[in-house]
């Protein structure tokens, strides 16, 4: 429920920097400067020319992935009002399906293909349906400047309600009103909750947040009559309850207090909240607030406390479901609404990661569980909150693949006296003393990069690669404290952990191995920072939309989502924090050395990490490195922070092929 907008905009700063001095001309906010576009196209031509050398590897990967196509277990459909719904892709295009509950004949509710096929980038944000009205948000250029579209399913007529909004959308039960979050024109900060009359297009601002380091958002309540609207920064929350039909907004559930977070939901005319009011997150309950009367803190009654806090909760007709963690094991517990525990069971099974998917609405009493490991195909299970039983729904089957041929394990590496977990996998009969390592990392915002099962990763294992994920500080592997140890002035800890993981994996199992790195977005900070620390530790790297110009990005609060990110990256207006940021900033720390080969991918319309960050970074590497690379820049002129799903697989094949070509060359030289 917490906001996850990150990396909107790059900012010019007066900080002295060779990189900035030499390559600031690559920044073009209009994305129309012919000199810049010509440079990016020339770099693409250079990259495409080099990629021809290993085109056979790229095509082989695509063929392997195609031949390994799974007999997919059906993903559970969303349950709403006794109907099942599924937004899926067919031949690459989005289509919305529905059926009666329990696997009746499906029907096409809406086919997005005509909207999608005429564009080189197309992404759906969220969709809602009430009766014959379908409301969705769409991004048509990768800029994440969504627009809301209302469709009359009887006639098929579609019309745009509003543009330059966030991706979220809600539709009132009577379908007469839409709810969106409008963005500031210049900064793209989500700052207004806007209610739109779907018949007249009349707009009304329900709540505007003027504090520049706060963001606005909303989510539906378990009780379909309501939504929770909120404003929050990195550590503080303010929420109100909205009646979707009437548009009536309650007073704040609790006035904002620095460091106090709470996330509420509504059921049975009561409000339940997960809050760190008393330190650890715990569940509280209170009565529905009146319109103009603030909820007194004294009216919050404790509902559930746990030694390590409550991670999340969900409300169903049959009870409240809570997730807690003990010894890094997550537990699902079901409680009656009078607070009595009805059932408790582990979320994960041995060796697998698992997470909940709330695809069932309040009355369905169904919650879905997705689980897998790096070498075990995905499994869908369903937990019935009413009868308290768990059943298998489906599992992906990969013919010719046997989990017994592979090893998936977790090791601990020491970094500055701290034990850092690393998930890794390899194929048993391919493990040799010089088997190379591909190391992936992210390490920010408290996100945990789960060790997913992916055919693409398995194809690397089949070619003798050890694939690893470093769960560095700054991520969420060990909870909130693990995040705190790698954010702000402690951000360098994330990079130190990644370097320590690479050093340990270089000699994993007594071997002498080449290490290759992959990182996306904040993971680019991690990889680029680690390469600055030890360029000779890495044999190659792939960075996708990398956040590498940190001090510059965080030095101008007038541009997108800068002040909101001080807690994560540091505040350059404070001398001590600026010093810490300068110490890890990837561009500021490029120096004369033999940097490894790199492939950097950027999206021209990216509003989170603008294209010029990666372009400036690689230009500086190319001009400074004492090695010959190659240093390849690839710009997607039709996407932003994410690539269009229709091109994503081919792009991933090119990235893996780049690394495999380096591995092949290295082995030939040994």
Which residues does each PLM region occupy?
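Asp-box/WD-like beta-propeller blade repeats and closely related beta-sheet repeat scaffolds
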Residues: 110-126, 135-138, 142-184, 191-194, ...
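Non-catalytic accessory segments flanking enzyme active sites
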Residues: 37-127, 137, 209, 214-232, ...
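Solenoidal tandem-repeat scaffolds enriched in leucines and small polar residues
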Residues: 167, 171-241
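Short loop/turn segments that connect beta-strands within beta-propeller blades
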Residues: 101-103, 152-156, 197-201, 243-247, ...
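Active-site-proximal cap/loop segments of hydrolase catalytic domains
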Residues: 472-670
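Structural WD40 beta-propeller signal
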Residues: 128-130, 172-174, 221, 267, ...
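N-terminal signal peptide c-region/cleavage motif recognized by signal peptidases
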Residues: 13-17
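Cap/lid segment of the alpha/beta-hydrolase catalytic domain
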Residues: 114-125, 142, 184, 394-516, ...
